[in-house]
Amino acid sequence: MEIFSTASFDKDFRKATKEEVKRINAIVEGLKASNFIGKPLRHAKNTYSVRIGNKRFVYNIDGSRILLIFFKSREGVYDYLG
């Protein structure tokens, strides 16, 4: 699978703690190896959220492409998604 990231995700990822980075990397490796991880988001097709501490890691799967969308606080994610 190919992995892409948004500018927003890159910015959020740079601000993440070492532990958060380890967990995100583990999730991404799991996505490459198998199937979906996390909770599907209702109003966004093929988009999933994984809780990491008090933040949410949001990604989209489209065929063989994984798009890392963002890693924000719960409020920030759901405000953004509407």
Where are the model-predicted features located?
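A short, surface-exposed loop/turn module that caps and links secondary-structure elements
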Residues: 28-51, 78
